[in-house]
């Protein structure tokens, strides 16, 4: 409560004493401002509304005619508006330029005030829309994100009503002031406006606006062509006169004459009707001035002969009486014609001072044909009508913004919104706002805006004063002598015109200049190397590194250096070379000067510190150096104390970080192809497999049951196996398709896989090596810089333009980074590259950082983020140096002729780090960490294989019995042959011929009977379905033929006895003669055979075969016993 009471008391005091309190409140920090008034902002719709009345178009006359008509007097009044017929805006005017940006400085095609020879129409309505659109783009103009809105009065042909071509600006909008007041209330005031902008064209309209402001207590700002005299000073009614700016030429010219004590003068007029009344009145009111004569050459300009004879007579008459000639109404062509003629025929007296009384355009000033000592003045930009309208709107916006920070309710909520109920409080919102209007000053588009005497808003342009002099090379050049500000001349420095006239003969053959140049080591702009044994530089320029800025020490060192007995210590000598040294040498050759070069003692660019400038700026200001050539950034603070040439190198600020190599993550082997490519490959694979299956089963030559009696079936699983084998280059056994279409599609898929695999292989090595990680910073506005986390370190070079930018734009960030700032750029780069690094980010000029990145042998540096703070490098010179314009002109020529490009290619043409060639073993050597993902993938495969095994058992034990018992879908050959056989376990293979060397094929629970070569009948009785390797038993059912099995003995009798023993005594079960089952090539049995082979028959046959095997085993055992006994008997007999 105490704090609120203090602010309330301070606001009341400020209302009583506005001027001093404006300075006090300017120093109040933003943190102490009024909290955001949410309810007030909601009531006004987050917008400040400004009303607009008297929006009829203006029709202006030519400058000369209009000013001659009214005598050029700013106070001339007209009760009736100027003549002219109002017309609606043409399609090409008005809204066609409403989208112009603020920095565009006006709409395209805008006419400058007073420019042109014919009448022109000014459109207040369009100018207001243009001003509101531009001002709403200015950040921070209004607090709390408020916006400006203009409420236009609905008049004839204006506002939201249809245009009326018959309307005339001369006809009054309302018949009397009270009707006008009522109309304003009903159309503008009811919408809650903070102020009114008006464009009156007569004294009667001014009186109406006086009435509105007095009755409704609303500030009114009238924009008029001429200042209207008023009997009463109403603080609520201000007027901005456009004619004030047009009549300033006379004030500037009189000030120039007074400054040089040129009180005796003559006038030379190129246009007879040119208005010089203002100038004549000013000189007549000053008793020191004496007008000798007026030379009017208007009638003689058409003929060169007449002009020559006329000037010869007139100038001869004033040769001994007039030291000064002031010219009015002359364009640059006429001026050049007059001076060339005077110089050629010697008409002009040698000591005559020439002054151009009219404001000149700086872009049109030339030196050819003009005399030395000529004085001119002008503005860098010419004001247009729209600029004054925008400045008036900005004046209201700034006043509202200042008032809102003290009492937002009184500043934002209009006191008058109903004319029938006008509040009679002690202090209305309009009266409160008018006090801030009277104390608001700013630099606008039309000039310096300020309020004089509480009712007159003035827009004063700063005129610059130029003098034509010779430069040190003997060439004419325009030198700025000063400026006209606030009604007086503020001189810079330079040679006075009379001094130039006195010494002009000395500049025709100037001596060679000798300059002292200071530089600063900054790669690639300035390098240094050691001198040779003799203290000389075989290449580059000899420079001194004295480690001091003392001018006396430098004088002694350079004196000793140029003397015959050189005593400068060799430790002070260096060889300087680089981008800027080449530029300096070229400038010295073209401008014919010599130079001494030294390195700045403190190694700083220059900053204001401890009450003085340091570094390069300090050397220039102290006179130690005449020129500073290095990567010298042009900024506002330096430009205010020294001169800069036009920039020879454009750059910005950047952020440098260090990269770190890391191993590729687990899924890095997938990175060579995008996930969409992987998805596309596997989708294409399965689609190809489907089409391969369809083509094979629909073809008459396919590997299908309906095909050409094939032994195998090409199913969908076979197609998948083919596609996967081709994709991964697997050399496993596959069943290729047999039809022609399938083979063509398979080869097409192989080509597709070849290109995909080669692309993957080409990118795999680069990906598997690993990526480089770094601090990702989006730019200077990155949260890591504004809210640095624990341990995040960043800095810049001390007393550099980068530090100055951060200090002014981001004070809190600058306070944090001060501890990490480094003395020079190489130090910051080294801090980044150290292990462990001392900096995480380094902010500096991007031109310097790019070079450091390009020469980094380890490829550890990288610039990140968007560039910011666009700036340029210029050559620094002492203030008001006559060399500034000449060097700037030469730099422009170097740019246009390509010399600067040659320097850039020479010193920046370094092979980028990313394009260097490294050893293959260094770049592509990969360990197990790079393939960790593949090992993980293999482990996952092992786990999936276990799941697959479990799935097979689930299918075999649960799914197959259910399909057998309940499902009617028993045919699965098109999907999987193995699955089909598992469902159909009882079928007979067809009878096939057998041979001695051919293996008999297996079957399930069936007997195959084959004929051998000796017509022996062999029977095969396989086991039940026990697996792929089935036990086969051969039965010799007919051994009485010639091709019988025999045992071989040494004794022929025994051999015959044993060999003829047969197994016919073993009763074999009678064999049934069965018809061969009719089978297809894929093993599918006929339905009749399946029904005939019952389980009981098979069991009986098995039992019989078991008995046969038992008997054969018994015979074999007994036979073995006999053979062993026979062997023992033979051995006993032999012994």
Curated annotation (Swiss-Prot):
D-serine binds at residues 633, 638, 801-802, 845. N-glycosylated. GO terms for biological process: calcium ion transport; dendrite development; negative regulation of dendritic spine development; prepulse inhibition; presynaptic modulation of chemical synaptic transmission; regulation of synaptic plasticity; response to ethanol; rhythmic process. Its main location: membrane. It catalyses: Ca(2+)(in) = Ca(2+)(out); Na(+)(in) = Na(+)(out). Residues 1-26 form the signal peptide. GO terms for cellular component: cytoplasm; glutamatergic synapse; neuron projection; neuronal cell body; NMDA selective glutamate receptor complex; postsynaptic density membrane; postsynaptic membrane; presynapse. Residues 695-715, 728-741, 949-1135 are cytoplasmic. Disulfide bonds join 537-575, 543-576, 859-913. Keywords: Calcium, Cell membrane, Coiled coil, Disulfide bond, Glycoprotein, Ion channel, Ion transport, Ligand-gated ion channel, Magnesium, Membrane, Postsynaptic cell membrane, Receptor, Signal, Synapse, Transmembrane, Transmembrane helix, Transport. Glycans are attached at residues 145, 264, 275, 285, 296, 300, 320, 426, 439, 549, 565, 886. Residues 951-987 are annotated as: PPP2CB binding site. It is found in: Cell membrane; Postsynaptic cell membrane; Postsynaptic density. It holds the Pfam family Lig_chan. Expressed in the brain (at protein level). Residues 59-118 are annotated as: Disordered. It is a multi-pass membrane protein. InterPro entries: ANF_lig-bd_rcpt, Glu/Gly-bd, Iono_Glu_rcpt_met, Ionotropic_Glu_rcpt, Iontro_rcpt_C, Peripla_BP_I. This is Glutamate receptor ionotropic, NMDA 3A.
